[in-house]
Structure formats: C-alpha cells, structure tokens
C-alpha cells in the first residue's frame, strides 16, 4: 500500500483514493491523527467533527470522495453542529444549526468530508484570530505570531496540513490576509460567485462587501473548488457573471500577453509600505514580465483615497448589531453586553445612532467608490499586482485593542496595526472584484509574504490562469512551516 503525504493537495489526495492506492478511511484517519497531534499547538480547529466525518466518509461519492475539508465557524453552517461565530454567549448556549448551508451541500455532493470547524475572531470583526470564546490561533511558521483574520483558523489549518482545503469568508481581506501570513493560497471571488445562503445572521453581506472564499496550497485546488461551490441560489442578494467553462479546465492555458499594473508603495501616504512586502510584489511582477506580460507601474487612482472607510465602518457597525440580534433569536434570548466582546458591544451602540437615511447614504458612497476602482480595468488594464498586506506579520496580542480604547478615532488608532493589514485588500471587497493572495515571498525572519493579484469583475478565469503561471515560475510547494520540519513528520496513512 502506498503512503499518502498529507502535504499533497486535494487533487492529489482524491486521485490516490480514486486509484485505490489508499482508502478514504486511511486518508481520514491519517488526517485525524495529524490534527490531534498538531492542533493543540496552533488552536485552529475549535469544533472537531471526527465521528461525523467517519460516517460521511463511508457515504462520500464524487470527484473528491473522501478528501477532508474545514469550515470557518461564521455565517456558513452545517446541520447538527455547534455554531458560535466565536460569540461567548452562543458558545455557552450550545446552539446547533438546523440546516446545511449551500456551500456545505455542494462540498458534500463533490465528495468532500467535513472534518471540523475552525477559529475566527468574534463575528469576523478583527484582522487577528484571538477571540475570547476560543482563544488565539497561532501561526504554524512561528507560534508567537498572528494568523491574521478573520479566517485565521482556515489559513493556519491549511498551512499546517490539517486539511488540504478550507472555507473562509472575506469582508475586508479576511481570506487574503490569513493566506498571506500563513503562506497558502487564498481566493476572494467575485461578489455573488459563491452563495453564503441561506443566511441566518448577516445583513445583506455587509452591503455586498462580504464574500465567501477558499483556501488551498495549490492554484489547481482553488480552481477545482470554485467549480464545486460556484453558483447563484434562491435568496442570494448578488449574482456573479456565469463562467463560460469550468475554471479547472482553463488554468493551464496561456492567457496571452496581458496589461498588468503594479503598486508597491502606499498611495495615501499615511504610512510606509514594508520594503520586504514591496519586494515580494516586485518579484512577482518581474516574473510576469519574463512570461511576456506588459507590466508597468500603474494602479487605480481611487486607491489613493481611503475616505470610504468611514462609511464602510458604519455599515459594519450596523451589520454586527443585526448579527447579534439575529443570533439572539436563534438561541431564544437576546444577547447582552456580557455575551460579547467589548468592541462588538461598542459597535452595537454606534449602530443604534445610525438612521435609515444615513445607512443608505453610506451604501451609496461605497457604490460610488466601487465605480472609481473598477474604471481602471475598464480603461484597458487586465490585472493589478500588489502586496496583500503592507506590514510584517504581527505578534499575538499586538492588534487587540485594550478595553476602553476610543473607537470613534479608530481610523487613526489603526494606522500602525489593523489598517496596515487591510489597506490593500478592503477596496476590492467594496468593488466586488476577484482577488487572490499567493505565497510568493518570505521575510528575513522566515515568515511568508503574500502577493495579491486582482482581476476585473467576473474574471476569475484570467486571475487563476496567471496565478498558475506564477506558481510555475515561483514555486512555493516545497516551503513548509517550522511546525512541520523534518524532525516532525506528517503522519502518513
């Protein structure tokens, strides 16, 4: 019997099962053993579903029959399983979801087996994953560093080979930021590409800024996953343009010479871009130029304007207030100040001051900003390449605000922290465009640095083709985190 290396991607694992080289039971048990050995050190999987996975593995059919995956404990739910959104009161209630999200249904139909649920900051409101409800998730590359957020559990889990792929969602960079600092591939698709439904706690997907996303260690896995989970479902607020063919079918094709803009400085000027982050983006740009693309220093002028953040943050306040309200409805009692973290309750208090007319004005401003961003692509550019984050990976605890911090002045307060994590990601949540973070760079202290590529609305096909080109030109698969060094082998089935 052949042994499986759990560092192999989902496509390779599925082929081993399909060919009979390994059984789905052997694959699952090896994965469970690895999670049990490694997860106590990083705290990525907070709700293990091993017995459920064993039952589902026996019944799994489809192209990925028996391959495990992990689900972020936020918005997208799985029937019968604990659902908390990392809210203390929800965790204490023991609430279990009464349905499967469309995402979960589609993953099961493709044969994927749900292994567990992974950590997130409370309701996804932080760019580091350190909720009071479950504790901090630690970076497999350095246990003293953050995994980013809000899909930090997903990024850490895929980086540590706890599963080959994972679900995430992204309202300001919450897939791309963890992908960058954990050294994996993270895709935020076009708005409406993946259904978040049937929603139970969110309000209009944060005015369209929140998108379901995907984590993997290879571009081909991202393409295959997107084929599995894409598509409009009843009740979805937004709908992405239909792809002309499966993404996995087209990623190996040469897209021809494309016009690619590069941004390696902060156009707002309120902080300096970390030189190693800038260097990683320049390295990727040079690789694209060597592949025949027309690469130039160019970017949307709108990226030099961050005034939209005030309106965006107001919308976030209202979305969180509504999420707290609806979670209370799920457990049969209102959630109170004692049930949530102090920052979440401050958001509720601010949301209570927002009128309907003021909220509508904020949405209008985001739509206006989105148009300004998108017009750059309309002018003939195909892709934008830039750092995913603009700073080095923070330490655990560095980004958590002390209780009592004046959140009214949070734009200024976040300049040295959270804003530097999301400054280059949140504009594309507002515009709804597809964006991917690739683990191209490494810092001088051994931490991954992601490079972000952004395509025009609906053009994941082009995005993935170029991502695959970069994966071939600047391969990252041989780099493994310190947690998985040779002295500590990944269990084989």
Curated annotation (Swiss-Prot):
The active site is at 72 (charge relay system), 150 (charge relay system), 174 (acyl-ester intermediate). Its EC number is 3.5.2.12. It holds the Pfam family Amidase. It catalyses: 1,8-diazacyclotetradecane-2,9-dione + H2O = N-(6-aminohexanoyl)-6-aminohexanoate. GO terms for biological process: nylon catabolic process. Catalyzes the hydrolysis of 6-aminohexanoic acid cyclic dimer (1,8-diazacyclotetradecane-2,9-dione) to form the linear dimer 6-aminohexanoyl-6-aminohexanoic acid. This is 6-aminohexanoate-cyclic-dimer hydrolase. The lineage of its organism: Bacteria, Pseudomonadati, Pseudomonadota.
